[in-house]
Amino acid sequence: NISGGRTSGYMLRRHLDAHDGTLPPDCHAVYANTGRERHETLDFVAAITERWGVDITWIERDRDAGYREVTYDTAARDGEPFADLITDKHYLPNAVARFCTQDLKIRPAAAFMRARGYSQWTSVIGLRFDEARRVANVRSRDHGDWDIACPLYDARVTSDDVLGFWRAQPFDLALQSYQGNCDLCFLK
């Protein structure tokens, strides 16, 4: 899963480097757009595709099919997937019911994998060594059809490592770390 942030971009680069610059045929880089992503995030994901020559499949939540494929040009930019989810739920995500990630990113990505014929897969998540609480939380859950891998945590990669990598690149996410990718997120 590609979140559109620096850490997931760094994780993708490491994965590409481990496989001679290309993704294995059974590996899918998937970016789930909420429709509330900052334009800088969309530009960053598009730049990764263009500069690294990697195929990233863009998806959005679809009420009926679970997901729909979109592109950089057709991706929602006015909050449509988020608004549709709020209409379906009849309330807003909040600190107690944080359903936006689950319903706008995780479930569409799972629907994408099932549509490709997978009944079991590993979801690789860009959580770092300095995010131990988040890693423990993710690893403690039963994810059903998929397993979770946190290779950056296992490799003891920290925020400083990720920021150092991007400082050496000819492009970067044009956001400060505290800003977050989704413009409505109350977690940042």
Question: Predicted segment positions?
Answer:
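Nucleotide-activated chemistry modules centered on ATP-dependent adenylation/adenylyltransferase
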Residues: 1-188
